[in-house]
Design a protein with these regions (language model features):
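PAPS-dependent sulfotransferase catalytic domain
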Residues: 1-126
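PAPS-dependent sulfotransferase catalytic core
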Residues: 105-153
Protein backbone atom coordinates (compact mmCIF):
# COMPACT_ATOMS: atom_id res chain seq x y z
CA UNK A 1 0.00 0.00 0.00
CA UNK A 2 1.16 3.52 -0.73
CA UNK A 3 3.05 4.66 2.40
CA UNK A 4 1.19 8.00 2.58
CA UNK A 5 -2.24 6.34 2.48
CA UNK A 6 -1.09 3.58 4.80
CA UNK A 7 0.03 6.04 7.50
CA UNK A 8 -3.18 8.08 7.34
CA UNK A 9 -5.24 4.91 7.46
CA UNK A 10 -3.31 3.64 10.49
CA UNK A 11 -3.61 6.97 12.31
CA UNK A 12 -7.36 7.06 11.64
CA UNK A 13 -7.66 3.46 12.85
CA UNK A 14 -5.84 4.28 16.07
CA UNK A 15 -7.74 7.50 16.65
CA UNK A 16 -11.52 7.04 16.34
CA UNK A 17 -13.65 9.67 14.55
CA UNK A 18 -10.71 11.78 13.46
CA UNK A 19 -11.05 14.59 10.88
CA UNK A 20 -8.03 15.64 8.77
CA UNK A 21 -5.77 18.10 10.60
CA UNK A 22 -5.73 20.61 7.68
CA UNK A 23 -2.19 21.74 8.25
CA UNK A 24 -2.09 22.23 12.01
CA UNK A 25 -4.34 19.71 13.60
CA UNK A 26 -5.23 19.34 17.21
CA UNK A 27 -3.87 16.64 19.45
CA UNK A 28 -6.10 13.63 19.86
CA UNK A 29 -6.32 10.79 22.33
CA UNK A 30 -5.31 7.36 21.14
CA UNK A 31 -7.47 4.41 22.05
CA UNK A 32 -5.24 2.61 24.59
CA UNK A 33 -6.86 -0.74 23.87
CA UNK A 34 -5.60 -0.55 20.27
CA UNK A 35 -2.11 0.77 20.85
CA UNK A 36 0.82 0.80 23.24
CA UNK A 37 2.09 4.30 22.73
CA UNK A 38 5.28 6.26 23.25
CA UNK A 39 5.41 7.04 27.00
CA UNK A 40 6.34 10.71 26.58
CA UNK A 41 3.04 11.65 24.96
CA UNK A 42 0.53 10.52 27.60
CA UNK A 43 -1.58 8.94 24.85
CA UNK A 44 -2.17 12.36 23.23
CA UNK A 45 -0.57 12.54 19.80
CA UNK A 46 -0.86 14.91 16.85
CA UNK A 47 -0.52 13.58 13.31
CA UNK A 48 2.84 15.36 13.09
CA UNK A 49 4.08 13.56 16.23
CA UNK A 50 2.72 10.28 14.91
CA UNK A 51 4.69 10.66 11.65
CA UNK A 52 7.82 11.67 13.54
CA UNK A 53 7.62 8.55 15.70
CA UNK A 54 6.74 6.31 12.74
CA UNK A 55 9.78 7.56 10.84
CA UNK A 56 12.34 7.79 13.63
CA UNK A 57 11.53 6.05 16.91
CA UNK A 58 12.22 2.34 16.57
CA UNK A 59 12.34 1.64 20.32
CA UNK A 60 8.67 2.35 21.02
CA UNK A 61 7.04 1.87 17.65
CA UNK A 62 6.05 -1.78 17.53
CA UNK A 63 2.84 -1.70 15.50
CA UNK A 64 3.20 -3.70 12.27
CA UNK A 65 0.93 -1.24 10.46
CA UNK A 66 3.86 1.19 10.57
CA UNK A 67 6.78 -1.07 9.67
CA UNK A 68 8.17 -0.76 6.18
CA UNK A 69 6.47 -3.27 3.91
CA UNK A 70 9.81 -4.52 2.56
CA UNK A 71 10.70 -5.51 6.14
CA UNK A 72 7.35 -7.20 6.80
CA UNK A 73 7.66 -9.22 3.59
CA UNK A 74 11.36 -9.96 4.20
CA UNK A 75 12.38 -8.58 0.81
CA UNK A 76 14.88 -9.48 -0.69
CA UNK A 77 15.31 -12.60 1.50
CA UNK A 78 12.08 -14.02 0.08
CA UNK A 79 11.56 -13.85 -3.67
CA UNK A 80 7.88 -13.39 -4.45
CA UNK A 81 6.36 -14.43 -7.75
CA UNK A 82 3.60 -11.84 -7.43
CA UNK A 83 2.83 -8.99 -5.02
CA UNK A 84 -0.61 -7.42 -5.27
CA UNK A 85 -1.43 -3.89 -4.20
CA UNK A 86 -4.39 -2.69 -2.18
CA UNK A 87 -4.89 0.06 -4.77
CA UNK A 88 -5.48 -2.67 -7.41
CA UNK A 89 -7.07 -5.22 -5.10
CA UNK A 90 -9.95 -6.25 -7.37
CA UNK A 91 -7.70 -6.72 -10.40
CA UNK A 92 -4.87 -8.38 -8.49
CA UNK A 93 -7.15 -10.76 -6.60
CA UNK A 94 -8.85 -11.80 -9.85
CA UNK A 95 -5.41 -12.48 -11.35
CA UNK A 96 -4.44 -14.73 -8.43
CA UNK A 97 -7.78 -16.56 -8.44
CA UNK A 98 -7.47 -17.26 -12.16
CA UNK A 99 -3.92 -18.56 -11.64
CA UNK A 100 -5.35 -20.91 -9.01
CA UNK A 101 -8.09 -22.05 -11.41
CA UNK A 102 -10.82 -20.83 -9.06
CA UNK A 103 -14.42 -21.31 -10.21
CA UNK A 104 -15.79 -18.38 -12.20
CA UNK A 105 -18.36 -17.53 -9.50
CA UNK A 106 -15.49 -17.03 -7.01
CA UNK A 107 -13.67 -14.71 -9.41
CA UNK A 108 -16.91 -12.77 -10.03
CA UNK A 109 -17.64 -12.45 -6.30
CA UNK A 110 -14.10 -11.24 -5.63
CA UNK A 111 -14.65 -8.43 -8.14
CA UNK A 112 -17.37 -6.88 -5.96
CA UNK A 113 -15.86 -4.02 -3.95
CA UNK A 114 -17.88 -3.24 -0.83
CA UNK A 115 -15.35 -1.89 1.65
CA UNK A 116 -13.50 0.88 -0.18
CA UNK A 117 -11.19 2.83 2.09
CA UNK A 118 -11.22 6.61 2.27
CA UNK A 119 -7.59 6.90 3.38
CA UNK A 120 -6.54 8.25 -0.02
CA UNK A 121 -9.08 11.09 0.16
CA UNK A 122 -7.15 14.35 0.06
CA UNK A 123 -3.86 13.15 1.49
CA UNK A 124 -2.49 16.64 0.92
CA UNK A 125 -4.73 17.76 3.82
CA UNK A 126 -2.73 15.53 6.13
CA UNK A 127 0.86 16.11 5.02
CA UNK A 128 2.93 19.26 5.14
CA UNK A 129 5.97 19.40 2.85
CA UNK A 130 8.21 18.47 5.79
CA UNK A 131 6.08 15.51 6.89
CA UNK A 132 5.87 14.17 3.34
CA UNK A 133 9.66 14.34 3.03
CA UNK A 134 10.12 12.39 6.29
CA UNK A 135 7.86 9.67 4.90
CA UNK A 136 9.69 9.63 1.54
CA UNK A 137 13.03 9.16 3.29
CA UNK A 138 11.94 6.55 5.85
CA UNK A 139 9.82 4.51 3.42
CA UNK A 140 12.13 4.98 0.40
CA UNK A 141 12.56 1.22 -0.09
CA UNK A 142 8.78 0.75 -0.11
CA UNK A 143 8.36 3.49 -2.71
CA UNK A 144 11.09 1.93 -4.90
CA UNK A 145 10.25 -1.75 -4.45
CA UNK A 146 6.52 -1.37 -5.03
CA UNK A 147 6.82 1.39 -7.64
CA UNK A 148 4.80 4.02 -5.78
CA UNK A 149 5.13 7.66 -6.85
CA UNK A 150 6.99 9.92 -4.43
CA UNK A 151 4.34 12.60 -4.89
CA UNK A 152 1.19 12.66 -2.80
CA UNK A 153 -1.73 11.05 -4.65
CA UNK A 154 -4.39 13.55 -5.75
Amino acid sequence: RNPFARLVSTYKFLVPRLPPPNGGGSKVHLNPSKYRWHPGFNNTVSFEQFIHIACTDKQYFRDQHIHRQVDLLHIPAISYEFIGKIENLTHDLSFVLRKLNAPSWVVERAAIVDNKTRADDRLSDWFTTELAEKVRIHYAEDFRTFDYPYSLPD
